[in-house]
Amino acid sequence: MDQFQALIEPARQFSKDSYRLVKRCTKPDRKEYQKIAMATAIGFAIMGFIGFFVKLIHIPINNIIVGA
């Protein structure tokens, strides 16, 4: 029985700690959620433009190298 308890105790402690953490956390309010969503959208747009311009620059360079 002691071996069984020693095996189960870490999982039980982890579940108790996880439950306590979730109960302590708070959901973001509407203003905070909109701020996070806007920052994420701006980040996606910036990364998209960077990828587009890199592709735009490398297409002519690739055509020069392959076409030669």
Swiss-Prot record:
Could you list which ranges are Cytoplasmic topological domains? 1-32
Q: Name one GO cellular component term.
A: Ssh1 translocon complex
Q: Which SUPFAM superfamilies match?
A: Preprotein translocase SecE subunit (SSF103456)
Q: Where in the cell is it found?
A: Endoplasmic reticulum membrane
| Main location (coarse class) | endoplasmic reticulum
Key words, A-Z: Developmental protein, Differentiation, Endoplasmic reticulum, Membrane, Oogenesis, Protein transport, Translocation, Transmembrane, Transmembrane helix, Transport
- Pfam families noted in UniProt: SecE
How is this protein positioned relative to the membrane? Single-pass membrane protein
Q: Which domain of life is it from?
A: Eukaryota
Q: Name one GO molecular function term.
A: protein transmembrane transporter activity
Q: Which residues lie on this side of the membrane: Extracellular?
A: 62-68
Cross-referenced PROSITE patterns? SECE_SEC61G (PS01067)
Binding partners and assembly: Heterotrimeric complex composed of SEC61-alpha, SEC61-beta and SEC61-gamma.
Q: Which family does it belong to?
A: Belongs to the SecE/SEC61-gamma family.
Instruction: Tell me the function of this protein.
Output: Required for oocyte development and ovulation. Required for the translocation of secretory and transmembrane proteins into the endoplasmic reticulum in vitro.
Q: What is this protein called?
A: Protein transport protein Sec61 subunit gamma
Organism the protein comes from: Caenorhabditis elegans
Q: Which gene holds the coding sequence for this protein? A: sec-61.G
